[in-house]
């Protein structure tokens, strides 16, 4: 009995490792699902657009085209039928023969042209936006030109005070010359007058003495 007891716990660890292997096996399955190609609707529209039959493409011919593109038709048979019905309801495909998924299908030219027109409008809008951005550039050039005008005006203001200072100096210099000349003349006249007055007084005194 003592020998059989340790054997039971030794068998337990392999049972715990088994779930880890199952989890590792599940991960690749998830990766395969993500790596699936484009949706069925896109493949159907491409196959119908590639066909040159005027009456439309039958379901059998459609399946052959999808199988040639590498799509598993047998597993995704129900998806193909649902994709056809949804494309017909959206107006992308037109059913020329039969009802439901069984019949012939043709690409709707109006729907294809309607999809092309919005793309053309977007391209036209993008072109219209570009000239608006180009028109903004000249505004920057005018802004850069304004400092030049301001720089030209400043020297003119500096020249006017200099010219005014020159005229003031010219006007002041003649006034000084006029003031100095009369002063010299007055001093000369004052010096001459006393000399002339003294002899007259002396003559008068001599005449008075003679009369006595």
Swiss-Prot record:
Gene ablation phenotype (knockout): No visible phenotype. Triple-deficient mice (H1-2, H1-3 and H1-4) die by midgestation with a broad range of defects. These embryos have about 50% of the normal ratio of H1 to nucleosomes, demonstrating that critical levels of total H1 histones are essential for mouse embryogenesis.
Positions carrying Phosphothreonine: 146
Modified residues (N6-methyllysine): 34, 186
Subcellular location: Nucleus; Chromosome
Keywords tagged on the record: Acetylation, ADP-ribosylation, Chromosome, Citrullination, DNA-binding, Hydroxylation, Methylation, Nucleus, Phosphoprotein
Matches recorded under SMART domains: H15 (SM00526)
GO biological process, alphabetically ordered: chromatin organization; negative regulation of transcription by RNA polymerase II; nucleosome assembly; regulation of transcription by RNA polymerase II
Modified residues (N6-(beta-hydroxybutyryl)lysine): 34, 52, 64, 85, 90, 106
H15 domain mapped to chain residues: 36-109
Subunit structure comment from the entry: Interacts with TSC22D1 isoform 2.
Protein name: Histone H1.2
């Amino acid at each position: 009995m003592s020998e059989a007891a340790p054997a039971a716990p030794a068998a337990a660890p392999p049972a715990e490792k088994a779930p880890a292997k199952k989890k590792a096996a599940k991960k690749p399955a998830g990766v395969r699902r993500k790596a699936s190609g484009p949706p069925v609707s896109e493949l159907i529209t491409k196959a119908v657009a590639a066909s040159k039959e005027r009456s439309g493409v039958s379901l059998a011919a459609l399946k052959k085209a999808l199988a040639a593109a590498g799509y598993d038709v047998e597993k995704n048979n129900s998806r193909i039928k649902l994709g056809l019905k949804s494309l017909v309801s959206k107006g992308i495909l037109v059913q020329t023969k039969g009802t439901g998924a069984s019949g012939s299908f043709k690409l709707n030219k109006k729907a294809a042209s309607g999809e092309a027109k919005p793309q053309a409008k977007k391209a036209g809008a993008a072109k219209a936006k570009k000239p608006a951005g180009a028109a903004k550039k000249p505004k920057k050039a005018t802004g850069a030109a304004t400092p030049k005008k301001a720089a030209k005006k400043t020297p003119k203001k500096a020249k006017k005070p200099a010219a005014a200072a020159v005229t003031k100096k010219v006007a002041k210099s003649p006034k000084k010359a006029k003031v100095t000349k009369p002063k010299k003349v007055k001093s000369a006249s004052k010096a001459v007058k006393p000399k002339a007055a003294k002899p007259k007084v002396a003559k008068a005194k001599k005449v008075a003495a003679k009369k006595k």
